[in-house]
């Protein structure tokens, strides 16, 4: 399967490839279809985020080209670092959650880095919102409260994924609302 790098996205033009990639774990967004319940509903090109594309290349599931040149994992990762702020942190959390079996999608509409599903979009609502942080960064109590309000109003659990870039370890902290 082949994708083409277009700015900070990956375009899968072949419809059969688009279906196969989506079927592997709800990767990407088909053009013109908001939340397909199955890969068979896809009848258009698929757009992957650069993070998804880098992950799929690392797993050997996808080849990505730019101007006719095949891009390997290291090159794509470096492109991510130069084009996307916090790429190392975001990619670390994305990869870790995918390796744990979760379906990880953009959480931007919720003010989070990722919306995380146990089954998949279109089948369930995402139970978790994840914010990826460098363990050396600071976050204020007001920021945590703001994230918490959004997650609570959308009935999702808020999780901070805290990354140590030196050793690659990630700690997760979940916040829950209590009625007292």
Swiss-Prot record:
GO molecular function: lyase activity; nucleic acid binding; tRNA-intron endonuclease activity
EC code: 4.6.1.16
InterPro entries on file: tRNA_endonuc-like_dom_sf, tRNA_intron_Endo_cat-like_sf, tRNA_intron_Endonuc_cat-like, tRNA_intron_Endonuc_N, tRNA_intron_Endonuc_N_sf, tRNA_splic, tRNA_splic_arch_short
Keywords: Lyase, tRNA processing
One GO CC annotation: cytoplasm
Active-site positions on this chain: 117, 125, 156
Catalytic reaction list: pretRNA = a 3'-half-tRNA molecule with a 5'-OH end + a 5'-half-tRNA molecule with a 2',3'-cyclic phosphate end + an intron with a 2',3'-cyclic phosphate and a 5'-hydroxyl terminus
GO biological process, one term: tRNA splicing, via endonucleolytic cleavage and ligation
Free-text function comment from the UniProt entry: Endonuclease that removes tRNA introns. Cleaves pre-tRNA at the 5'- and 3'-splice sites to release the intron. The products are an intron and two tRNA half-molecules bearing 2',3' cyclic phosphate and 5'-OH termini. Recognizes a pseudosymmetric substrate in which 2 bulged loops of 3 bases are separated by a stem of 4 bp.
Family: Belongs to the tRNA-intron endonuclease family. Archaeal short subfamily.
Subunit (UniProt): Homotetramer; although the tetramer contains four active sites, only two participate in the cleavage. Therefore, it should be considered as a dimer of dimers.
Protein name: tRNA-splicing endonuclease
């Amino acid at each position: 399967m082949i994708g083409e790098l277009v700015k900070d996205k990956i375009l899968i033009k072949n419809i059969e490839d688009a279906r196969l990639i989506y079927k592997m774990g709800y990767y990407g967004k088909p053009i013109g279809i908001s939340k397909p319940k199955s890969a068979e509903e896809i009848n258009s090109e698929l757009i992957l985020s650069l993070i998804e594309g880098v992950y799929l290349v690392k797993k050997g599931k996808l080849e990505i080209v730019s101007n006719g040149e095949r891009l390997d994992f290291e090159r794509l990762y470096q492109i991510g670092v130069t084009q996307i702020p916090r790429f190392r942190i975001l990619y670390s959390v994305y990869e870790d959650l995918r390796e744990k079996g979760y379906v990880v999608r953009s959480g931007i509409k919720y003010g989070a880095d990722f919306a995380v599903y146990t089954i998949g979009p279109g089948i369930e609502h995402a139970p978790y919102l994840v914010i990826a942080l460098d363990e050396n960064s600071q976050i204020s109590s007001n920021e945590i409260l703001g994230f918490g309000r959004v997650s609570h109003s959308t009935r999702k659990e808020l999780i901070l994924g805290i990354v140590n870039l030196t050793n690659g370890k990630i700690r997760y902290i979940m916040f829950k609302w209590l009625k007292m």
